[in-house]
Amino acid sequence: MAATLLYNRNNVSQLPFDTAAMDPQVLQKEMDDAFQADPALGWCLNRGTAPNVKHVRQCRSWDCGLACIQMVARLRNDALTFKEISKLCGNITSIWTVHLSSVLLQRNIAHAIVTTCAGVNQDLESLSFYQDHIEQEKNDVLRLFNTSINNGIRIIESGYSGVNFKHLLLTRRVVLIMLVDNRGLRCTDCGCMKRNWFSCGFTGHYVLVQGYDEEREAFVYHDPADRVQKCWMTLLQFDQCRLVKGTDEDVVVVPY
């Protein structure tokens, strides 16, 4: 993988994918290590109560990540507005996962980043979704990664299967802000694809995953582009929409 990486990588954990894939608990152990260091956080077991996520719709084509941040803020009774989030992002319209981390950091919201590239993946230049602006944004993205790391945000640089995230959601009180290919989102409740897979190339989109429903055997998520309050996707669909070139398998893990 061609990538522009960080200079300061003291807080970046690197795990081989095979290790993560074989042990469903490996991600949970990483999160335990990341969050138990903060006794004020109250990092605790999932007692079977799903979080009361208030659905937020995005306002424009590019602000799905901001809508996910607002849903997280509402979980914490933080009345953060779109305007305030946009200002914390620097009033830009090209949002990377590390911009979302920056907002959470500025609001003192504990979180960790899971990604296959803690930096700028130059392979993304081949995708039309990125190619017009990746060079101009590279320095800003690297600066924000370093800021997050220097402020103690844990970054785990590894690939994980959906089984790892299923186990984490069932055993720990967390929500996930997840970068997906918008073409691959499929809600099992309505039974149809949200977007046409063949209509265009990769289209990055953020969704908020609030838990795993064992009765339905599906992840529960909020799509900011949809009026529907909750959607569901199977383990297979979960991986199909995120394990694609363009996402770097980015997930922001936020305890609540």
Task: Please describe what each predicted stretch is.
Residues 100-203, 252-255:
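Predominantly the structural core of cysteine protease catalytic domains
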Residues 2-121:
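Active-site nucleophile-adjacent alpha helix/oxyanion-hole segment immediately C-terminal to the catalytic cysteine
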Residues 56-59, 88, 158, 188, ...:
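Surface-exposed loop/turn and secondary-structure junction residues enriched for glycine/proline
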Residues 62, 176, 207:
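Residue-level detector of short, conserved catalytic/binding motifs and their immediate flanks
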Residues 63, 81-82, 96, 161, ...:
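Helix N-cap and loop-to-helix transition residues
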Residues 2-41, 170-171, 181-256:
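Noncatalytic regulatory segments and standalone regulatory/sensor domains
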